[in-house]
Amino acid sequence: MAEIHVLAPIDGTVVPLEEVPDEVFAQKMAGDGVAIDPSGKVAVAPISGELVKLFPGGHAFGIAAAHDVELIVHLGLDTIELQGQGFKNIASEGQHVEPGTPVVEFDRAKVEALGRSVISPVVSSGAGTITRKASGAVRAGQDVLFVIEV
């Protein structure tokens, strides 16, 4: 078995997925993981892989990694409705990324001013089982958010 260490994609405080005020994430319909109440301004790649999906509005991205591991990083809740307000894509879809590669700029104040939650789920939607989850404060590209065993 291999262990994939998924780093925090943005500075902030870990929130258990079950406490996310969105049923799709709270009930793990999109996959297991955790969420972050972000304090940072840039979302980075949490693992090495290919940026297989980068939404034009910048509110979410997906990475395909080794061992069929797939991650979804969703910045805020219902933020697709903002049509890019509060987000700026830095990376490009199809690009290879390493942990810490900047992907999206995030304006927390603007997203909140537009009436959206900034709670940001990070979920594993591919192979493997999450074995350890962080709690407390995490730093983007530095601290392990969770571990996936594949």
Predicted regions and their residues:
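Contiguous, well-folded functional domains in the mature portion of proteins
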Residues: M1-V150
